[in-house]
Each structure stands twice: as C-alpha cells, then as structure tokens.
C-alpha cells in the first residue's frame, strides 16, 4: 500500500481466490502471492523496510494472507532496492533493510512456507549471502536484457546481445552467493520491436497481427540460441522467444542443476498455449 506502506492490496481478490481454489483439484500445487512489480508497484517497500515496526506489521500481513487464502508462500518482487526506478523512493540502506524485512517475513510465516524473491539479471541490490538461510529460491528475471537491435533474452553471448544474457545472469547470482539448485531461470513470453526507433513490447500471441513486424524475416542466432526478425539488411528489428529457444533454455536449466524455470507471463502466450506447452514438455521429458 502506497499510503501506509504496510497493508497489502490484491489487484483482483476474486480472481486470486479462484487461483487459490485450484489447490482443491491438486493439493500438491504450490501457490505463492507475488508482492511488488516494476515501477510504482514497488513504491512503499523502501519506506516500510527502513522502519522496524512497519517491517513487523507487513510481515504479519503476509502471514494473514497466507492463512486467509490457504496458499503456500510469498514472493517479494521489489524492483529494486537502492534504485529509483520510475521515481520510487530508495536509499543506500535498502539492501541491508531488505534482508531485515525478509527475516521478519520468515519469522512470521514460519519455515514450512515458501519465501522467494525476484532479482534482475545483474544480481545487484541484494546481499545474497545473508539471504541464503532465509529464502527458498531466487527467480531470476533473465529478460529485458536488451537495448535497441539486441536480444531480449539470449541464452548465450553473441554479437546481438547486450551486457547480459541468461548464462551470465545465472553465473552472477551463483558468484553472489546463491547455489545453482536455488536459482530459477526466467523465460519471457514476449519480445521487443526496435522498429521506428522505440523499444516496444509485443506479446507472443500478438506477433502475427502486429503491423510493425510486417515485411521482416525470421532468423535463428545459432550462438545465442534465440530467434529474431530482421529487416532486408539483416539487422535485428524484433527480439523474441519461441518454442525452440525455450526448449534450449529448459535443457540448460536441467543440465546446470537449477531449481527450475518460470515464465513472464501467462497472458502473453497464444490461445493454443504454444510456449507454456513447450516449457512443460521440455522440463518433463
């Protein structure tokens, strides 16, 4: 909550209750509530985490929601401690306060509930060594790693990658203190167009009808293991993932011994479930 910094507002409580009800069909299903998000969705974290009293109330509110909905855990998606993303409040003490907040949440919800966090590809902003005993696993947002005419989520480095790619993101988190078996690789169900000089997000399900992509030709980057659409000069104009590239990433996650994979996000997949089915098949084969 952006006014008192301790209450937790669920965007669509009716829909979330429907999701929680899925546990009746599959009792082994794990459902977590993710709190935060990009930009103003993370407003209030810094103000709350710097105050011991507010940390405790926030943690108790997390516990209350777990009990109310009968779900399995909390995911903290603070984007990002110490960073003024989209103008949100931040302080250099956020990293230390983040750990204190997570300790308070763990104390409130107990050891039998899941506590996870979302982290950018750079592995900055967190003290992972201090968080290791508190957090069950880290969801690496190994996407949004592109500038103009670059891959959004390359598995490996190529001439079309920016400063980060999936393999590097995993390595940085491992070097920062988190073991591979507690790392989850993020998979994007969307891409970015560089047509017209502006980076524009386009969902996988909308690719065929998107006018910006007309006249572009699909190519495969054999080094980065991702597809892209290029103009007549071979210049990357649209970066995205498809079933093939997600298959390579799932194979990498299994061979590397990662905790697993996660996707962002369900709504961006097509009606046939092309991407989520590809991920499921690759992870279960």
What are the functions of these language-model segments?
Residues 33, 76, 105, 138, ...:
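Conserved, mostly hydrophobic/aromatic
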Residues 181-252, 272, 277-285:
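Glycan-binding loop/region signatures in secreted carbohydrate-active enzymes
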Residues 265-272:
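A short, acidic, flexible beta-alpha connecting loop/helix-capping segment that sits on the rim
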Residues 1-66, 276:
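Glycan-recognition patch characteristic of GH18 chitinases/ENGases
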Residues 72, 136, 259:
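Receiver (REC) domain switch/active-site residues of two-component response regulators
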Residues 50-68, 120-129, 240-254:
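Short, acidic/polar
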Residues 18, 22-25, 65, 100-108, ...:
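Alpha-helical structural signal in soluble globular domains
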Residues 1-14, 60, 81-214:
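Substrate-binding surface in catalytic domains of secreted glycosidases
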